[in-house]
Amino acid sequence: MSENSTIVSNTANLVKFLNLDQKGSILAEYIWIDGANGVRSKTKTLFKKPSSVEDLPEWNFDGSSTGQAPGEDSDIYLRPVAIFPDPFRMGDNILVLAECWNADGSPNKFNHRHECAKIMEAHKDQKPWFGLEQEYTLFDLYGNPYGWPKGGFPGPQGPYYCGVGTGKVYCRDIVEAHYKACLFAGIKISGINAEVLPSQWEFQVGPCVGIEMGDHLWISRYLLHRVAEEFGVKISFHPKPIPGDWNGSGLHTNVSTQAMRDEGGMKAIEEAIQKLSTRHAEHIAVYGDDNTLRLTGRHETGNIDAFSYGVADRGSSIRIPRSCAKEGKGYFEDRRPASNACPYQITGIMMETICGGI
């Protein structure tokens, strides 16, 4: 990995300091979503281990430096909403997911969690389960797909998906490290696999209930960026990272309610798909930036201008797994969301469409 990435953290030198006694202090890494749909974080020292988010103090940051506020009124407030164990500092140290709020007490315009949480609470009796398949691509420091020949291209797609062996997969060490970091942090990560495009991988998170889906997906993204730092590698969630005859990256969204999982649930699945067909444009609007480059009707995608569904059809907007069609119950997969989409917006509009607004 050193050939492609020359700037790597001196982790071995850091370890002896990580093992120093903190004298009872707790390091809390506050994490939030910025104005460019990325993650930011900063650290606060606590003098008592919190037992819940209610024990954590509200904090603030300069929103003019994150695209979330103008310079003349730049204070944005961080309200903790979830706690996770910290896999980097370990011990009693924690990761804190926080929502962003304006000084006037209103949610920041990039705080999509707030509205999502309200609709999840309104429809909690439906017992919604979600599972997200996060695809991403790894690049070196200079913007080249990791492991690709300098100034050239690897062989055509085919051997890379779930590949094994040198020349078929790249950066497995980063992927494995991220997997373990997620497990340590309590993320409901359910699997990993190499993807169709060389240097592209996927991890799955879920099933998660309601708002938990967005929380776990965002923290897993944060962990991926942090792990990649250690290796001097960049993570891209762009839905079409390489132009041409190469697969894009998606955030396939698996959805079910209790009615869909019960006997005869196929009727509820079909009713949900019918509702989704009437709001295709509204969903596409929040399903990620640059998705037009990915949803072309090629490379295992449907066309962005047309809604479609089918059993086991990866070229459709909505796929019903063959096993679910056979059993007459289960879940469906929305294949439209781009890899850079916000999970709160995806799951929020999904519940609004299939269960009703509030």
From Swiss-Prot:
It comes from the Eukaryota. The keyword ATP-binding applies. It catalyses: L-glutamate + NH4(+) + ATP = L-glutamine + ADP + phosphate + H(+). Its EC number is 6.3.1.2. GO terms for biological process: glutamine biosynthetic process. It is found in: Cytoplasm. Gene3D superfamilies: Glutamine synthetase, N-terminal domain, Glutamine synthetase/guanido kinase, catalytic domain. GO terms for cellular component: cytoplasm. One of its GO terms (molecular function) is glutamine synthetase activity. Residues 26-105 form the GS beta-grasp domain. Keywords: ATP-binding, Cytoplasm, Ligase, Nucleotide-binding. Residues 112-358 form the GS catalytic domain. InterPro entries: Gln_synt_N, Gln_synt_N_sf, Gln_synth/guanido_kin_cat_dom, Gln_synth_cat_dom, Gln_synth_gly_rich_site, Gln_synth_N_conserv_site, Glutamine_Synthetase. Belongs to the glutamine synthetase family. Homooctamer. This is Glutamine synthetase. It comes from Tuber borchii. The gene is GLN1.
